[in-house]
Amino acid sequence: MWHARALMESRCATISEKRRPSARRTARLLITALLAAGTASAGVQTIDPHALYPEGPLWDQGRLLYVEYAGPGIKSWDGKEATVWWRKAHCGANGLIHFRTDHILVACYDGNTLVELDRRGKELRSIDKDSSGQPFVGPNDFASDGHGGIYFSASGVYDIKAPITGKVLHLSADGRDIRVVADTIHYSNGLTLAKDGRHLLVAEMLAGRVLSFPIAADGSLGVRSVWARLQDLALPTPNEDAYDGPDGIKLGPDGNYYIAQNGSGRVLVVSEDRKLVRTISVPTRYVTNMGFGPDGADTVYITGAFDPWKAPYPGAVYRWTR
């Protein structure tokens, strides 16, 4: 997620020349789009039309949990209605993940903390710094390391002109050690373990690209490389500007990567070899994240905001079915 409350006056740039596709690239992308499965929007159903800047959808115990960044905390959707499940003032909840079998971690972007909950929503602890004593700045999203530990992004400042301070940190499986494993990322956002289990993909939102890091045996990350640039995956939409980019990213049960393109109202579904498989369009322009239910990739839950510039920051949660 990106956060307009911290940057109301700054977002006035249009797409820069370096992000504008060339004529040859545009033609190639157009052919790719026509050959791909196409835009999948007919199967989109709104399940919460009144969500306040929703994010972080997570299937849990037969229900969908998701956060409201501009709301009280976490909501639960049981298949019929959405209710508030957990509240915390000044949190600015932004991401969710399972931890320690039946616990849940919450990223509090505004509170600069991680909160650990039990299965009933009872707060067990709050963490605001890494093991070296450095405070978190904008905890944003999570990914499993495949061994019980967690990677999470600490985005830094959402300003394209600000110093580049985004980080990725690793939380050990026992919950005792938290260390920085990557830094100088231009607003680190969504992240996911790659299909091979040996790389971590990280959305570098303000650079408009997804990075890949090799994972060492101790969970540390090696030298980064560019996995994909969004401008190489799909044609730009009419209203894109320099702040639009990848938000949440997930490896789907079907082996494809799902990238929430914030500012473009769509999720890009991309194959392992970086080819566009399909796009899923939703009514909210500012798509933040997506998650999967028990049906695997046949059901995708998508969160997004209509207006991130003005309170109460209205948004919606969708269910896309194939």
Which stretches of residues belong to each language-model region?
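Short loop/turn segments immediately following beta-strands, especially the blade-tip
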Residues: 213-220, 322
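Beta-propeller domains
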Residues: 66-84
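Short, solvent-exposed loop/turn segments at conserved positions within beta-propeller repeat blades
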Residues: 69-70, 109-110, 159-166, 205-206, ...
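A short loop-to-beta-strand structural motif that recurs across blades of beta-propeller domains
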Residues: 73-75, 113-115, 167-169, 209-211, ...
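Beta-strand initiation motifs
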Residues: 42-43, 80-84, 122-125, 175-179, ...
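Beta-rich, blade/repeat-based domains predominating
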Residues: 48-64, 69, 88-108, 113, ...
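Bacterial N-terminal signal peptides
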Residues: 28-38
